[in-house]
């Protein structure tokens, strides 16, 4: 190996050790619940815990609801900003980036104050209302990631030409959006969806202060009262996050601007008009 390559290789190796060693140590500790042998006893205990199944199921359902609401909000917004309201683009980008600046604790206290039992819209009076409020909060937290992913996908296709072609064939606006534009940004929407899923699964502040049985507060509770199970849960959460990142990369590598079957864009416009 050339001397000029040794330095970068050493830096990469040390950086890899910095990230990999804590994971290896955590995984090794999670296998040490039974003295003297390595076993998956901690994982068995975690998966056998009814509270784990309840909280994880709750967070998965909340994540799916967040993805649906986020996509319904972001896809039309990104479409209209690129098609008709280019001057509003800086404002829309500023609004979508606010969740990165404003702490979640500020958001949740605002929700509690605005939608408490004495409010004109008392969401916190019922479990279903509080769950809905939690999903709204998750949508806000996921806006920077969902909007950026969808907007990047729309930048890769000619929205104006597609819209004009579909309109010339008699397609309505809703048809254009859902049958022409959406199939071409499907990979971008899925990328934002996987990021949203990873965020919601581990979110703690909103779920804890709204007193919802989510996976994030469960992780904190187990971490405060157990020894080996938190390590197992950390590895499970890590695996879920990296699975989402892998799926994101898989869909992101797909060529934009083509339908699922590989047909050109103008054929989508013709099909939408039928």
What are these regions (language model features)?
Residues 166:
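The alpha-helix within a helix-turn-helix
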Residues 158-162, 262, 271:
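Short glycine/proline-centered loop/turn elements that form peptide/ligand docking sites
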Residues 169-170, 183:
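Glycine/proline-centered hinge or cleavage motifs at structural transition points of membrane proteins
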């Amino acid at each position: 190996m050339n001397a000029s390559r040794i330095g970068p290789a050493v830096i990469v190796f040390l950086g890899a050790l910095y990230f990999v060693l804590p994971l290896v140590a955590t995984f090794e500790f999670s296998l040490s619940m039974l003295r003297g042998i390595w076993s998956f006893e901690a994982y068995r205990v975690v998966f056998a815990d009814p509270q784990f199944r309840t909280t994880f199921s709750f967070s998965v359902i909340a994540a799916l609801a967040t993805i649906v609401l986020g996509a319904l909000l972001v896809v039309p917004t990104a479409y209209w900003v690129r098609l008709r309201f280019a001057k509003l683009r800086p404002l829309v980008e500023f609004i979508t980036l606010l969740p990165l600046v404003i702490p979640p604790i500020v958001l949740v206290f605002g929700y509690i104050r605005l939608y408490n039992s004495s409010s004109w819209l008392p969401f916190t009076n019922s479990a279903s209302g509080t769950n809905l409020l939690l999903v709204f909060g998750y949508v806000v937290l996921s806006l920077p990631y969902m909007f950026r992913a969808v907007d990047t996908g729309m930048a890769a296709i000619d929205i104006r030409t597609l819209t004009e072609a579909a309109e010339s064939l008699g397609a309505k606006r809703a048809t254009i959006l859902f049958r022409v534009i959406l199939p071409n940004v499907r990979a971008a929407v899925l990328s934002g969806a996987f990021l949203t899923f990873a965020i919601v699964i581990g979110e703690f502040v909103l779920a804890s202060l709204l007193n919802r049985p989510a996976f994030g507060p469960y992780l904190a509770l187990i971490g405060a009262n157990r020894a080996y199970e938190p390590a197992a849960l950390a590895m499970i959460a890590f695996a879920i996050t990296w699975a989402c990142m892998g799926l994101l990369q898989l869909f992101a590598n797909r060529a934009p601007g083509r339908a699922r079957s590989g047909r050109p864009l103008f054929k989508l416009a013709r099909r939408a008009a039928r």
